[in-house]
Regions:
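Short alpha-helical "recognition helix" segments of helix-turn-helix
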Residues: 18-24
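Short hydrophobic/aromatic segments of transmembrane alpha-helices and their interfaces
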Residues: 22, 67, 250-251
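Single, function-defining residue in the core of a domain
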Residues: 1-17, 32, 43-46, 53-55, ...
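P-loop NTPase switch module centered on the Walker A-proximal segment
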Residues: 70
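A short, well-structured juxtamembrane/interface segment
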Residues: 59-67, 137
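A short structural micro-motif
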Residues: 26-27, 46-49, 61, 276
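Short, basic interhelical loop/turn and adjoining N-cap
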Residues: 24-40
């Protein structure tokens, strides 16, 4: 059951089951071993927390055994939220809620949030919650997965005095983009034309009430403001808890915050390559199973591609363009192969062969290429699953 759900389920459920058992017992024609109705009944007994624990174990082993990339000695933790489209079923609507656009039909959505390591490509923690939950509240739920000695990268939707107070109380550092007109200290900083300054955030009125309602202190917080000029000419202001200019010079923060873009790319991969919105069931339970199962499989693929990338870096050293493993191909190769990896008593040879395939499928990296961002919706219908 667990291995089947980890196998990047995207097609018609009965076809996926037949192919799964064909991998376990190869033959010319896939045999009918388990019916979809039997599977649907059995999966009701599977707690989605099984996949959460698998992911936690994978992450712990990676950071214990592997060479970990850090930024100036700090682990980076990018936190961001998004939404997922869900089946329009009564149970999904009751569990997750809907968005009501002004000029279109209601959409059944879930709010998701991730703690992502942009340097090592791993999702450390993932939450799927009702659409009405806001990203700041989900950030608080992530705090148990955040450790001292790490730095949070936050988008402009997170800054609030109570959020910084919660991080400060737990001695967790941060770097966040802030809107130019939200904070008086930011407006004064911009008006003065300064590039780098330490200022003090003092809570007033609503900010104090928000802290008290959450049991947080209302003491003033010293922060550092840094002006960043983008190639487009746009000015961004970063607010950080890293006050020491010698350890963390101002010019280091633009490249630092740009690293957060890796999380946006991870969300794109999660939605478009892994097809997390292509659900295998319609209930709240099956949605949570699919979500956390695909988080684990994406993470496992990232771990294997990192290992393959070490071979690529060595083999292509001196090339005019650096090369990187093609993650889309790696995810395709994991389909079916993952079943063999997780069911064999000694999968080491298969693991080596898989990593070798990853290392042979690479693409050149050409930095500073810019393309317009196109937003579009590509939905999945429960009754129209792909044949593959």
């Amino acid at each position: 059951m667990v291995v089947f759900l980890l196998n990047l389920i995207k097609g018609a459920l009965q076809r996926e089951l037949d192919q799964f058992f064909q991998v376990l017992s190869p033959g010319d024609v896939a045999k009918r071993v388990v019916t979809k109705s039997a599977f649907c009944a059995a999966r009701q007994k599977l707690n989605p927390s099984a996949f959460i624990e698998l992911n936690r174990h994978l992450v712990r082993r990676w950071y214990h055994d592997a060479p970990v990339r850090r930024w100036r000695g700090l682990d980076l933790r990018a936190i961001d939220g998004s939404t997922l489209r869900l089946p329009d079923t009564p149970e999904a609507i009751a569990s997750f809620g809907q968005m009501f656009p002004a000029h279109s039909d209601p959409a059944t959505l879930a709010r998701i949030s991730q703690v992502y390591d942009p340097l090592n490509g791993l999702i450390l923690d993932a939450i799927i919650a009702p659409y009405q939950r806001d990203e700041r509240a989900l950030l608080v739920e992530h705090l148990a997965a955040l450790e001292a000695g790490s730095l949070r990268l936050l988008d402009c939707g997170y800054p609030a005095f109570w959020v910084f107070a919660a991080l400060q109380t737990r001695k967790l550092g941060w770097c966040a983009r802030v809107a130019l007109d939200t904070w008086s200290v930011v407006r004064d900083f911009v008006a003065a034309g300064r590039d780098d300054a330490v200022v003090t955030l003092i809570p007033h009125g609503e900010a104090q009430a928000a802290c008290r309602s959450r049991g947080l202190p209302t003491t003033a917080i010293p922060v550092r403001l840094i002006r960043v000029l983008l190639p487009s000419g746009t000015v961004e202001i970063l607010m950080t808890s890293l006050l020491d200019r010698d350890d963390h010079p101002a010019e280091a923060f633009a490249p630092l915050y740009h690293l957060r873009w890796a999380q946006e790319e991870n969300y794109k991969c999660f939605k478009c390559r892994v097809e997390v919105e292509n659900w295998s069931g319609k209930s709240s339970l099956t949605i949570r199973q699919d979500f956390h199962a695909k988080v684990f499989t994406l993470n496992l693929t990232a771990v294997l591609t990192r290992t393959a990338q070490q071979q690529v870096d060595e083999h292509h050293r001196g090339d005019s363009h650096p090369k990187q493993v093609n993650l889309t191909h790696a995810l395709c190769a994991m389909k079916g192969t993952l079943v063999r990896l997780l069911t064999r008593s000694d999968p080491l040879d298969l693991l080596r062969a898989l990593i070798d395939v990853f290392a042979r499928t690479v693409e050149p990296v050409r930095p500073r290429r810019l393309y317009p961002r196109r937003k579009g919706l590509h939905g999945y219908h429960m009754a129209y699953k792909p044949c593959s």
